[in-house]
Amino acid sequence: MKKNFILNFATKNVKEKKLSFGVGITLWALIVFAYMIFVMNWGFASAGLNGKAGISGYLGHFFPNANEAPGTVVNQAVNWGITIGRGIGSVLVGWLIVKISHKYTVILSLFFMLFGIIAPYSPTYAGFIILRTIFAIGGTMQIILIQPVVSNYLNQRQKAVISQFSPFFYPIGTIITLIPFAGIIGQEAQEAFRDNWQIVFLVIGLLTLIPLIGYIILGTKFDLYPSNIEKRNKQEKLSLATFFKQKDTWYWTILYGSWLVAVVFPFTFSKPIFHRLIGDSDGTFNDKISVFLIFFLAGMFLGPFTIGLLSKYQLQRRKYISTIITLGVFFYVLATVVFVLKVGKNYEYAKSYTDGWTWLFLFLGLFMGICLWGIQGVMLNLPHEYKGSNPYRVGFQFGLIWGLGYTAFTIATIITSLVNTPPGIDLKKLELNNVDGYALGAYILIIIFSLVSSIGLALLKEPNPEYKKLLKIRSFSEIERIKK
């Protein structure tokens, strides 16, 4: 292992300690809490704190004159650039772990997140965007940094369980960002929230100090323990180039990028597309769509205990994952049909929840969430299940899965955004006639991109081909739990 001054410092006085479950869970909790903080900070920007140029929110702050505000294409380009930056940061995680150790990579990523504290007080919009990009790179790294902890400290059964809970923190953070803008706290409270956007970002940013201080004190240098270094020296030498040459890396990119579309695009595109499909330019159903998204995200809390239970048992994974993702996308299509043909036609009930069609719409969102969020744990546990898996390999692999997955997700975002809002097209001048062709085209793309995951799964190898196929099980007694 080539050393540098940071790694030299990190390796001083390293005393090997037992890799106990309690220490592993503590480190896991600090990192997932940091990830939830990132999701909250990032989500509030698009959920409502952005406001409108010349009126309120951070857009009103930086552009008191609405005519000076950047156009739609510029805003989209900024978002694409930030997402690409997050992808690059994800790819670099594996390299950083090798160069400066896992503990110092975590601390560095949390330091990046501290830029979220000063970003709201930037004197310029450009500075605000740059500082939030640095913050976002650090935040995105958290979900990858979990994996070496899980891989080192937990046995196979514990990994299967913890993989069910790790995904909880994205929906929890996102639900928190949606609640103030879902019509629950009232219009005046919404406006107060939006007017005090700097304080909201400041408070969330300061929470980053909790995992940062916690990891400085409690973080371990498990990857630098002599026993781990000895194991790594006996293993194959890995680099980013090694994984780029492997076909499985690109199959994972297809799978993970497509799954990201399936779970993130409904949050990003549902409001503008749903409104345009019914010819509503006033956002009349904004609150109801927000509640639909909350139901969708709430599916995460049921999914791991239903859909996600497969990880605990000796059953084949690939076809099961593909079926569940397809079912989740199908529920989204059904929910859209119900909204366009029934819920969105009834303006009298736009702000109420007493009609049956509204509840069908909401519960379809819940079923969609149970499928798409519930399967994440099964999917993310796959790299741990392949023969020859080890903490060193998993760290590299997850960095690439997230980084390249984000890149694929960004490409899908650019294509969908350009179809939804083509450059040079003034949406205000379109004759809607209840169906906006651009919005419908974008929606169809979302469905197609979400289903591409099946291609990635078909190309990947089954990690345990000796496990039984779920459809061939005839009684529960045939299903065996995974042994330690």
Curated annotation (Swiss-Prot):
The chain crosses the membrane at residues 19-39, 78-98, 110-130, 134-154, 165-185, 199-219, 249-269, 289-309, 321-341, 360-380, 398-418, 440-460. It comes from the Bacteria. GO terms for cellular component: plasma membrane. InterPro entries: Hexose_phos_transporter (IPR054938), MFS_Mycoplasma (IPR011699), MFS_trans_sf (IPR036259). GO terms for molecular function: carboxylic acid transmembrane transporter activity. It is found in: Cell membrane. It is a multi-pass membrane protein. Pfam families: MFS_Mycoplasma. Its main location: membrane. Keywords: Cell membrane, Membrane, Transmembrane, Transmembrane helix. PANTHER family: CARBOXYLIC ACID TRANSPORTER PROTEIN HOMOLOG (PTHR23508:SF10). NCBIfam families: MMSYN1_0881. This is Uncharacterized protein MHJ_0132. It comes from Mesomycoplasma hyopneumoniae (strain J / ATCC 25934 / NCTC 10110).
